[in-house]
């Protein structure tokens, strides 16, 4: 059979046994990739600093997904939250990876078995003796089983009734840990940032799936609907399955990029909107002001800011700063964060406190402008020194650090002040190690960006696939070139072509 590459899947079109076989083999490949990728990531992952070098800075992709489902310990003796452990149990990162690889091997063997033993009785229609599948019944079975899995996940795994729970954190990604979740049955359950909605929605959707599955197992579709939607054609199944997949891909691309309870910032990094809105900056200032209200000094107030919170307020952790074709982890870009230098506060010779205007997300370069509390420009680093009025030298800007490694240190020489003003454009200032990984200083995206880009791209491709296969199954007779006024009853055989002498026909 001389098939072109884009039509090779027609070999399983009317062969249920081998159709099942190739799907099992596909599952083997997916599971094998997941397990192998997990082992690779574990081989290169450095768990020593969960605050300044978390998994998302290291470009980990599958470790965050395992972690959000409750895996936190490694057979290597470390925990994702820091510290050492003695008894990680079987469901460690390596245990989950191994289970996927074992499952992949079993699926591989099952796929071979079904390829060899393709002509099973279960695939034969008793009336005709030909291979056929009762697709509406199979739909009911799959709906029922997926409903059971969905309900079980929400009612047992997430709630901790039989399972670890899921990763839950505070709004600023500081206190995350795996814990059981109670379902949220009120309006708050529809808030995408409320973890309880994950439990309640899985329970509700699972219940609906079980009931819908039982319905489709016990009720046959009407003949007109069966014919209108081509329910007897396997390509209808392909088209509707692709629709389900691309819809899910669009949804998860959204929940990942905009953030939700399912994509914690401790595991996937912050979102770009948290930088755009000054989300962490506002919380830092709120905490500092609260400290000052308790009669703490400026230095003491800033010293109480956790490094983790300060690190989120750094543009290098913004997933939108990485280019699409800049391969590698964030650590390969601006380097491995070593420590927080502290918060710089700039002042001019008149005593005004100055704030450096921060770089917007989609700028690579941005003018250094310092404004006072009223937004009035007081100082800058001019492009043309001959026309400058507000240069650091003319205005007499000084900088003093509060909190961090440089706490209490001040500088008044213009070159140093300008250096820290440029760095303050990028948020809180960190010492970054570029030597270890030979980092090039160009920002990279986090796994949040890669996941979103990948799923949005494939969702678009799968959307066209749904249209393509849906059109093929709905207009199959048109594409085959059949005259609608044909007065002969044609039975489509192997070739399904009009004028083919092997196609049986009967004059009406």
Curated annotation (Swiss-Prot):
SUPFAM superfamilies documented for this protein: Photosystem II antenna protein-like (SSF161077)
Cofactor annotation comment: Binds multiple chlorophylls. PSII binds additional chlorophylls, carotenoids and specific lipids.
Single GO cellular component term: chloroplast thylakoid membrane
Molecular function GO terms recorded: chlorophyll binding; electron transporter, transferring electrons within the cyclic electron transport pathway of photosynthesis activity
Principal subcellular localisation of the protein: plastid
Ribosomal protein as UniProt keyword: no
Residues spanning the membrane: 21-36, 101-115, 140-156, 203-218, 237-252, 457-472
Keyword field: Chlorophyll, Chloroplast, Chromophore, Membrane, Photosynthesis, Photosystem II, Plastid, Thylakoid, Transmembrane, Transmembrane helix
InterPro entries assigned to the protein according to its UniProt record, in alphabetical order: PS_antenna-like (IPR000932), PS_II_antenna-like_sf (IPR036001), PSII_PsbB (IPR017486)
Pfam families: PSII
Membrane topology summary: Multi-pass membrane protein
GO biological process: photosynthetic electron transport in photosystem II
Subcellular localization, as worded in the UniProt entry: Plastid, Chloroplast thylakoid membrane
Function description: One of the components of the core complex of photosystem II (PSII). It binds chlorophyll and helps catalyze the primary light-induced photochemical processes of PSII. PSII is a light-driven water:plastoquinone oxidoreductase, using light energy to abstract electrons from H(2)O, generating O(2) and a proton gradient subsequently used for ATP formation.
Assembly with partners or alone: PSII is composed of 1 copy each of membrane proteins PsbA, PsbB, PsbC, PsbD, PsbE, PsbF, PsbH, PsbI, PsbJ, PsbK, PsbL, PsbM, PsbT, PsbX, PsbY, PsbZ, Psb30/Ycf12, at least 3 peripheral proteins of the oxygen-evolving complex and a large number of cofactors. It forms dimeric complexes.
Protein name stated in the entry: Photosystem II CP47 reaction center protein
Gene behind the chain: psbB
């Amino acid at each position: 059979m001389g098939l072109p590459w884009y039509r090779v899947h027609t070999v399983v079109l009317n062969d249920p046994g081998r159709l099942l076989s190739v799907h099992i083999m596909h599952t083997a490949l997916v599971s094998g990739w997941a397990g192998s990728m997990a082992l690779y990531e574990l081989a290169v992952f450095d768990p020593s600093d969960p605050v300044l070098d978390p998994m998302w800075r290291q470009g980990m992709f599958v470790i965050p997904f395992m972690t959000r489902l409750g895996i936190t310990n490694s057979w290597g003796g470390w925990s994702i939250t820091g510290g050492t452990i003695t008894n990680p149990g079987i469901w460690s990162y390596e245990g989950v990876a191994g289970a996927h690889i074992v499952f992949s091997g079993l699926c591989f063997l099952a796929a071979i078995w079904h390829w060899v033993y393709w002509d099973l009785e279960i695939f034969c229609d008793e009336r005709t003796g030909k291979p056929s599948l009762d697709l509406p019944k199979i739909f009911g079975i799959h709906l029922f089983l997926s409903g059971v899995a969905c309900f079980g996940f929400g009612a047992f795994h997430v709630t901790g009734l039989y399972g670890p729970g899921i990763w839950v954190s505070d709004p600023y990604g500081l206190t995350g840990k795996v814990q059981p979740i109670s379902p949220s049955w009120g309006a708050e359950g529809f808030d995408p940032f409320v973890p309880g909605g994950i439990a309640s929605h899985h329970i509700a959707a699972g219940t609906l799936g079980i009931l819908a599955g039982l319905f489709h197992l016990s009720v046959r579709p009407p003949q007109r609907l069966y014919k209108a939607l081509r329910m007897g054609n396997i390509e209808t199944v392909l088209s509707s399955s692709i629709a389900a997949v691309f819809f899910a891909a669009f949804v998860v691309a959204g929940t990942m990029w905009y953030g939700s309870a399912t994509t914690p910032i401790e595991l996937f990094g912050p979102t770009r909107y948290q930088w755009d809105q000054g989300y962490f900056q506002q919380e830092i200032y709120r905490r500092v002001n609260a400290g000052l209200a308790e009669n703490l000094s400026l230095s003491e107030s800033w010293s109480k800011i956790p490094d983790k919170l300060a690190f989120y307020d750094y543009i290098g952790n913004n997933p939108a700063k990485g280019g699409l074709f800049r391969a590698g982890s964030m650590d390969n870009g601006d380097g491995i964060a070593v420590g927080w230098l502290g918060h710089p506060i700039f002042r001019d010779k008149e005593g005004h406190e100055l704030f450096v205007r921060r770089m917007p997300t989609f700028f690579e370069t941005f003018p250094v402008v310092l404004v006072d509390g009223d937004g009035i420009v007081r100082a800058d680093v001019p492009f043309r020194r001959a026309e400058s009025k507000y240069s650091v030298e003319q205005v007499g800007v000084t900088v003093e650090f509060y909190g961090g490694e440089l706490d209490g240190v001040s500088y008044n020489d213009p070159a140093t002040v300008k250096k820290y003003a440029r760095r303050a454009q990028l948020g809180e200032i960190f010492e970054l190690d570029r030597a270890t990984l030979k980092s090039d200083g160009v920002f990279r995206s986090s796994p949040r960006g890669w996941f979103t880009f990948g799923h949005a791209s494939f969702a678009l491709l799968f959307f066209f696939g749904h249209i393509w296969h849906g059109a093929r199954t709905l207009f199959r007779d048109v594409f085959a070139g059949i005259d609608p006024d044909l007065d002969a009853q044609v039975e489509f055989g192997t070739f399904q072509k009009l004028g083919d002498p092997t196609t049986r026909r009967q004059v009406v």
